[in-house]
C-alpha cells in the first residue's frame, strides 16, 4: 500500500461513496452549529419534513452576535439581547434546538462560548474525526489531527439531514517549521508569517499539514491558533498530527473516550494517523523558526504583514501592477503613509479575544505583560474570553483582576469585535490592535482599521497606545519601555482547565418537528409577525442552469473577500432572500450619505441588469463561509461569476444555489473584460462548458466536476440525491460503531439513526442540564 498523508488517511476512512468524476460522499463525525448560518438550514429541514440524522454528533451554541456585556441580571434571551435582528437569530436557534432535539449551550450555561473553543474544551473534537461548522474557522480543530473545515448554510442543512457531505479530494501541502522561536515570537506570529509568505491564495485547493520541531513543541492552544488561520492562507483545512501533547489535552474531557478500554482503543487508533514516511505532498514549504519575527499586519488582507520593527511598505516596491494597486488602496483605507515605522502608528482600541486567541494561555500571556501596568490614556481595551469556562478559570487565577487593574473591560464570552456583529465595534476611522483573524475593510466595524497580532503584543500596545514590539515591554530589549524594578513579580496559581468541566449528558428529546409542517412559521416567526410568504423556501431543488446569455459586469479587483461582497450587518437574517440591495455594500454606497455611488459598476446602466460578473483578479470570495454572499449575488440577478480562482467555501456555496463559478486564465478574462466594459452580452454555456465572446468568434473552455454539472443542469436537490444512498450511509454508520465506537454519542443505537435519550438529564453547573434554553 502506498504511503499516505494524515489528510489522506482521514479522508479515505470516511468515504461512503465516490462518483466516477471523483466527487466523494464522506461521513461527518462532528457538527457544530451557531445562530448565524443555521436558521435557513433548519427551515429547509422543516420544508422537506426531514429530521436531524445524528443529534448525538451535533452541538449548538450562540456566539456570533450575542452581547458580551455582564450577564449578572440575565433572565432570558428575549430580554437580554437588545438588537432585534440578533435577538431573532438567537431565539430562532433556541426554537430549532428544541424542535430537533440538539444539545445546546445557551447564555446561562458556563459551557457557552465560541464554537471553536467549546468543541475542543468539551472533548467533542477528536483526532481522526471529520468536523464541520457553518464558519470558516472550523479549521481550528485540525490542531487535533482532525479534518475540520467550514461549510455554507446549504451544506449545514445537508449534514443535518444526512450526516454526510459531497467533497472533492484536496491537494496536500506540507509546511515544516523547524528550530527554536526567538523571544517574543508566538504561534500567532508563525501563522501570520506563513500567510505573508504564501499569500491568501497560496493554499487554495490544498489541505495544509503543519509539521517540524517548532510545531511539535507547541501547546494545543498554540496549535489551534495556527490551524485557525489556515483559511486565511486559502486552504480548505489545516492539520497537525496528534501526539502525546494532544492525548494529554483530550484525556478526561466530558465527550472524550472514557478511561479504560474505550480510551485504549481510541489511543491505539489515533497513533496510526500521522503521515507515513515517504508520503507525497503536492507542495512543500520549509521555514526556519529563527526567521520569524514578532509580526503585525499593516493593510486590509492577512497577507499584508511586516515585522513590528519594520515600516509600512511602499507600493513602488510591489512585485506587479495589481499588487501596487492593492497596496495603494489598502494604505488609503488604513490611513497610513508608506515608510512609516510600524511602532509610530497610534491606536484607539485593543481587542483581545476571538476563536484565534481567547483561550486561557492567551489570557495568561496578555496578563503577564499587563501585570502592574496601566492602559495608555484615552485608549479603550476589551478582553473577551472564548467561553464561560475560560472566563471562570481566568477569574479563579486572578487574571480578571490584572486586566481590570490595568484598565481593560472584562467581558462575557462571544465572538465580539472579531467581526462586530454585536455592539462591540470600531467607529469609522478607529484603529485597533486585535488578536482576531481578519483585517478586511470594515471587518470590525464600518471604516474601522484592524492590525492583527498576538495577545502579548496587543497587551503591549495597550500599555503604550501605539503598535509596539512586545520585547520592549517585557524581555531583554535594550529599548525597554518602563521599568520592572518596582513591579511585584507576576505570580498566579495556574489551575487545571479540566477541573472546571462537568459531566456530559445525552441530547434532549426533540419536540414535534412534523407539526411545523412544510413552510410553516416557527414560534419566533409568529412572535415577530412574519408573513408566511416572506419565509424562504429551501430543500426543494433549484433553477436549472444550462446556458446563460447576458450583460457581464467587470470588477477589477483581487482578493475580493466575502465581507466586501456582503458586510456582517446583513447576515442577521433568517431568510435566504432580500439581500440583493446589500451586494457589495461598501462599494455601491457612499459611507456618509448611504446613497448609491455612481462610480461603482453595478450602479451604472446596463450593469444594473448584469447576469454575469467578470472578475479580473484571483481569489474571489475568500474569507468567511457566509452563504449570504452567494444569496446576495443571486438576488441581484448574477448567476455566473468568472475569475482566475475562488475561495473554496464560496465556490461550493455558489453551486448549492444554482450559480456557476467559472475559472479561466488571466488572458481569457482580459478578453472578456473588453466585452464587459463595452456593455456587450457574453454567453456561459454549461452544457458544452464554454464561455463565448459577444461576437461569437472566441470560445473559452472551462471545467466543472461532472456531478456538480449534472446537478446544476438538472436543478437537482443534492440532499435528496444523497438520501438515495441511505443504505450505504447506514452501513457506514454500523461499521463506524464497530471500529470507532468512541465517535458515537451517548445512547446512540447504530440501527436506529437516532439518539436514544434518557428520561432525565444529570444536573450540571448552575442548575443547567444537558441543554440550556
UniProtKB/Swiss-Prot annotation:
The keyword Transit peptide does not apply. Its cofactor is [4Fe-4S] cluster. Gene3D superfamilies: Aconitase, domain 3 (3.30.499.10), Aconitase, domain 4 (3.20.19.10). The keyword Nuclease does not apply. GO terms for cellular component: 3-isopropylmalate dehydratase complex. GO terms for biological process: L-leucine biosynthetic process. CDD domains: IPMI, IPMI_Swivel. Keywords: 4Fe-4S, Amino-acid biosynthesis, Branched-chain amino acid biosynthesis, Iron, Iron-sulfur, Leucine biosynthesis, Lyase, Metal-binding. Monomer. PANTHER family: 3-ISOPROPYLMALATE DEHYDRATASE, HOMOACONITASE, MITOCHONDRIAL-RELATED. Belongs to the aconitase/IPM isomerase family. HAMAP family: LeuC_type1, LeuD_type1. This is 3-isopropylmalate dehydratase.
Amino acid at each position: 500500500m502506498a504511503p499516505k498523508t494524515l489528510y489522506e488517511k482521514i479522508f479515505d476512512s470516511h468515504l461512503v461513496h465516490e462518483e466516477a468524476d471523483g466527487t466523494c460522499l464522506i461521513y461527518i463525525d462532528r457538527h457544530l452549529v451557531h445562530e448565524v448560518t443555521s436558521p435557513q438550514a433548519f427551515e429547509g429541514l422543516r420544508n422537506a419534513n426531514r429530521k436531524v440524522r445524528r443529534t448525538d454528533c451535533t452541538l449548538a451554541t450562540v456566539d456570533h452576535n450575542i452581547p458580551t456585556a455582564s450577564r449578572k441580571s440575565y433572565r432570558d434571551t428575549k430580554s437580554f439581547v437588545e438588537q432585534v435582528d440578533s435577538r431573532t437569530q438567537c431565539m430562532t436557534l433556541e426554537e430549532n434546538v428544541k424542535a430537533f432535539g440538539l444539545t445546546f449551550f445557551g447564555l446561562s450555561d458556563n459551557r457557552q462560548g465560541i464554537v471553536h473553543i467549546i468543541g475542543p474544551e468539551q472533548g467533542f473534537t477528536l483526532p481522526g474525526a471529520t468536523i464541520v461548522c457553518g464558519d470558516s474557522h472550523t479549521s481550528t480543530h485540525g490542531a487535533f489531527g482532525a479534518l475540520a473545515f467550514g461549510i455554507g448554510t446549504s451544506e449545514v442543512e445537508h449534514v443535518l439531514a444526512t450526516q454526510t457531505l459531497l467533497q472533492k479530494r484536496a491537494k496536500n501541502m506540507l509546511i515544516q517549521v523547524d528550530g527554536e522561536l526567538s523571544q517574543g515570537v508566538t504561534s500567532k506570529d508563525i501563522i501570520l508569517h506563513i500567510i505573508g509568505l504564501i499569500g491568501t491564495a497560496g493554499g487554495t485547493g490544498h489541505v495544509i499539514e503543519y509539521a517540524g520541531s517548532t510545531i511539535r513543541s507547541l501547546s494545543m492552544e498554540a496549535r489551534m491558533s495556527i490551524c485557525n488561520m489556515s483559511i486565511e492562507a486559502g486552504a480548505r483545512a489545516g492539520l497537525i498530527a496528534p501526539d502525546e501533547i494532544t492525548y494529554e489535552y483530550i484525556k478526561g474531557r466530558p465527550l472524550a473516550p472514557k478511561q479504560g478500554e474505550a480510551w485504549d482503543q481510541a489511543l491505539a487508533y489515533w497513533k496510526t494517523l500521522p503521515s507515513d514516511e515517504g508520503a507525497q505532498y503536492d507542495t512543500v514549504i520549509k521555514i526556519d523558526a529563527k526567521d520569524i519575527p514578532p509580526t503585525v499586519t499593516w493593510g486590509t488582507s492577512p497577507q499584508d504583514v511586516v515585522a513590528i520593527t519594520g515600516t509600512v511598505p511602499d507600493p513602488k516596491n510591489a512585485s506587479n501592477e495589481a499588487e501596487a494597486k492593492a497596496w495603494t488602496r489598502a494604505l488609503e483605507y488604513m490611513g497610513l503613509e508608506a515608510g512609516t515605522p510600524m511602532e509610530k502608528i497610534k491606536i484607539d482600541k485593543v481587542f483581545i479575544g476571538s476563536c484565534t486567541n481567547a483561550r486561557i494561555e492567551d489570557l495568561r500571556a496578555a496578563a503577564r505583560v499587563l501585570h502592574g501596568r496601566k492602559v495608555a490614556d484615552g485608549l479603550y481595551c476589551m478582553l473577551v474570553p472564548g467561553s464561560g469556562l475560560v472566563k471562570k478559570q481566568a477569574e479563579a487565577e486572578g487574571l480578571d483582576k490584572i486586566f481590570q487593574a490595568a484598565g481593560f473591560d472584562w467581558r462575557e464570552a462571544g465572538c465580539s469585535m472579531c467581526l462586530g456583529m454585536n455592539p462591540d465595534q470600531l467607529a469609522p476611522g478607529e484603529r485597533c490592535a486585535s488578536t482576531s483573524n481578519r483585517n478586511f475593510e470594515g471587518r470590525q466595524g464600518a471604516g474601522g482599521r484592524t492590525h492583527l497580532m498576538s495577545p502579548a503584543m496587543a497587551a503591549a500596545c495597550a500599555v503604550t497606545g501605539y503598535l509596539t514590539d512586545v520585547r520592549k515591554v517585557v524581555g531583554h530589549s535594550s529599548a525597554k519601555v518602563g521599568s520592572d524594578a518596582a513591579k511585584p513579580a507576576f505570580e498566579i496559581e495556574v489551575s487545571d482547565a479540566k477541573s472546571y468541566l462537568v459531566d456530559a449528558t445525552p441530547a434532549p428529546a426533540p419536540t414535534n418537528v412534523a407539526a411545523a409542517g412544510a413552510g410553516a412559521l416557527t414560534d419566533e416567526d409568529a412572535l415577530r409577525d412574519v408573513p408566511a410568504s416572506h419565509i424562504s423556501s429551501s430543500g426543494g431543488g433549484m433553477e436549472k442552469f444550462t446556458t446563460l446569455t447576458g450583460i457581464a459586469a467587470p470588477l477589477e479587483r483581487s482578493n475580493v473577500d466575502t465581507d466586501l461582497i456582503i458586510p456582517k450587518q446583513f447576515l442577521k437574517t433568517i431568510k435566504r432572500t432580500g439581500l440583493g440591495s446589500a451586494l457589495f455594500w461598501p462599494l455601491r454606497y457612499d459611507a456618509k450619505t448611504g446613497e448609491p455611488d455612481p462610480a461603482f459598476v453595478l450602479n451604472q446602466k446596463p450593469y444594473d441588469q448584469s447576469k454575469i460578473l467578470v472578475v479580473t483578479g484571483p481569489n474571489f470570495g475568500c474569507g468567511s463561509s457566509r452563504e449570504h454572499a452567494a444569496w446576495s449575488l443571486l438576488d441581484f440577478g448574477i448567476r455566473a461569476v468568472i475569475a482566475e480562482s475562488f475561495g473554496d467555501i464560496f465556490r461550493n456555496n455558489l453551486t448549492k444555489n444554482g450559480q456557476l463559478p467559472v475559472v479561466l486564465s488571466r488572458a481569457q478574462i482580459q478578453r472578456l473584460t473588453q466585452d464587459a466594459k463595452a456593455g456587450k452580452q457574453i454567453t456561459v454555456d454549461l452544457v458544452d462548458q464554454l464561455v463565448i465572446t459577444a461576437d461569437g468568434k472566441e470560445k473559452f473552455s472551462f471545467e466543472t466536476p461532472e456531478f456538480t454539472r449534472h446537478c446544476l443542469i438538472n436543478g437537482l436537490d443534492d440532499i435528496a440525491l444523497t438520501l438515495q444512498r441511505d443504505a450505504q450511509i447506514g452501513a457506514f454508520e454500523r461499521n463506524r460503531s464497530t471500529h470507532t465506537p468512541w465517535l458515537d454519542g451517548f445512547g446512540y443505537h447504530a440501527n436506529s439513526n437516532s439518539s436514544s435519550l434518557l428520561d432525565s438529564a444529570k444536573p450540571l453547573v448552575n442548575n443547567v442540564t444537558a441543554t440550556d434554553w
